[in-house]
Amino acid sequence: MKCPYCGARDARVIDSRELNGGESIRRRRECIACGRRFTTYERVEPIWLMVVKRDGRREPFDVGKLREGLRLALKKRPVSPDEIDRIVATVERELQSLGTSEVPSTLIGEIVLRELKQLDDVAYIRFASVYRRFADLEDLRREMEALGWRPRAAVTVDETS
């Protein structure tokens, strides 16, 4: 590993720690030549995936697009950025485990829905409404009932008092 300070090629590892549940490794290194310390990160290089859209178009898998969709679904919800990272890592891991170079966008959507369903019902409904293209409130009601939601009894107002 090349030292960022002096350019020497020899450095020794003085500490290693797993990050993100083993998804990456942080290493503290010390340059043999100048003695200065620096940090490097290692991560398995993701497999280059093409996403096959519903209309048949193909585009490269974009983790930023996935993260943005999750951010929008989870906006103003009590969910930490670490949870978003966990979902992104889960999606990437499951897609890579397929061992294929193309994945349907529907598979990505279903993995995200599964993870959101376990995490936050509101975020799940937000994501599902876009992903499943809810046409009307009836679609929304059906999805909410599938989550176990039941409508409240109608409340009548007594106008005589």
From Swiss-Prot:
Signal peptide: none annotated. Binds 1 zinc ion. One of its GO terms (biological process) is negative regulation of DNA-templated transcription. Residues 49-139 form the ATP-cone domain. Keywords: ATP-binding, DNA-binding, Metal-binding, Nucleotide-binding, Repressor, Transcription, Transcription regulation, Zinc, Zinc-finger. The keyword Manganese does not apply. It comes from the Bacteria. PROSITE patterns: ATP_CONE. Its cofactor is Zn(2+). GO terms for molecular function: ATP binding; DNA binding; zinc ion binding. A zinc finger (unnamed) spans 3-34. Pfam families: ATP-cone, Zn_ribbon_NrdR. Coiled coil: none annotated. Negatively regulates transcription of bacterial ribonucleotide reductase nrd genes and operons by binding to NrdR-boxes. Belongs to the NrdR family. This is Transcriptional repressor NrdR. It comes from Thermomicrobium roseum (strain ATCC 27502 / DSM 5159 / P-2).
